[in-house]
Design a protein with these regions (language model features):
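Charged phosphate-binding loop/patch that engages nucleotide di/tri-phosphates or the phosphate backbone
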Residues: 200-239
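A structural signal for short, hydrophobic/glycine-enriched beta-strand patches
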Residues: 40-185
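N-terminal type II signal-anchor transmembrane helix
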Residues: 12-49
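A transmembrane-helix-recognition feature enriched in membrane-embedded lipid enzymes
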Residues: 180-210
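A general structural signal for short secondary-structure boundary/capping elements
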Residues: 88, 103-108, 189-195, 215-221
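Aromatic-anchored segments of alpha-helical transmembrane domains
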Residues: 32-35, 174, 178, 217
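Terminal targeting segments of Actinobacterial cell-envelope proteins
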Residues: 1-15
């Protein structure tokens, strides 16, 4: 019997309703993926930072050295007197906030700075640490500083760990100075990363390794370390 005849017999063996159901499920799945990709693209390309005039503490998400200067400017302008600084790659400028008396920016006088290495080494690890510290300190308004393409995903992750019942989350954005290629790379990575966000709805929920590796590969292509490749640099609170 020919292969074509075999396929025909298989098709005839499936009831019409089953074939219709499979087609409907496949169509709905495709529409769901298309909607999700469109929503993620909109969130990455059209963020809405809050720029609140004052927060109890500001979480400085690591992305590139410019974020440290932006954090110093916000603290110096009176937005906050407490910084949680994700600083695990140094020395790359974080010493302006986390260094000794001779290295620290003088504009941070009177500002409490807590530098930490997140676990895991992701935005998720950073917001977990900040949320824990907010609860320990009895604080209720958390600011989060990151670059524009990351604002809405950072908001979603932060609000999962520091819920509306516990307080408020406000986002700030800084100019990362990306060129066209850099914006494209971060945009594509941001859209892909929303897949992980949707698959891990819990605050500390992690993807299985087989699903995490594409995101790790994207990080490496952007020149960022992954997991244990990041050298932990932790400095305690300074004022």
């Amino acid at each position: 019997m020919s292969a074509q005849a075999d396929r025909g017999r298989v098709r005839r063996g499936l009831p019409r309703w089953a074939r219709a159901l499979c087609a409907t499920v496949a169509t709905l799945a495709a529409l769901g993926l298309a909607f999700g990709a469109g929503w993620a693209t909109h969130a990455v390309t059209d963020p809405h930072p809050d720029d609140a005039p004052r927060v109890d503490a500001l979480l400085v998400l690591y992305s590139q050295p410019r974020v440290y200067d932006a954090a110093i400017e916000l603290a110096a302008s009176g937005v906050t007197d407490r910084l949680f600084v994700s600083a695990y790659l140094g020395p790359d400028g974080h010493e302006k906030l986390c260094g000794g008396p001779g290295e620290r920016d003088p504009r941070l006088a009177g500002v409490s700075v807590e530098c930490f290495a997140p676990d895991p080494v992701t935005t998720q690890g950073e917001v977990i640490h900040a949320a824990d510290r907010m609860r320990e300190l009895g604080l209720h308004h958390l600011g989060v500083l990151t670059f524009h393409q990351h604002v809405e995903r950072a908001r979603l992750l932060a609000e999962r760990c520091f819920t509306p019942e516990e307080g408020r989350v406000s986002l700030y954005a800084f100019d990362a100075g990306f060129d066209r290629l850099g914006r494209l790379q971060h945009g594509v990575y941001g859209v892909l990363a929303y897949g992980k966000v949707m698959l891990t709805p819990g605050c500390d929920q992690q993807l299985p390794g087989v699903l995490q590796w594409p995101l790790d590969l994207a990080k490496r292509l952007r020149g960022q370390p992954v997991g244990d490749e990041a050298g932990a640099v932790v400095v305690g609170a300074r004022r």
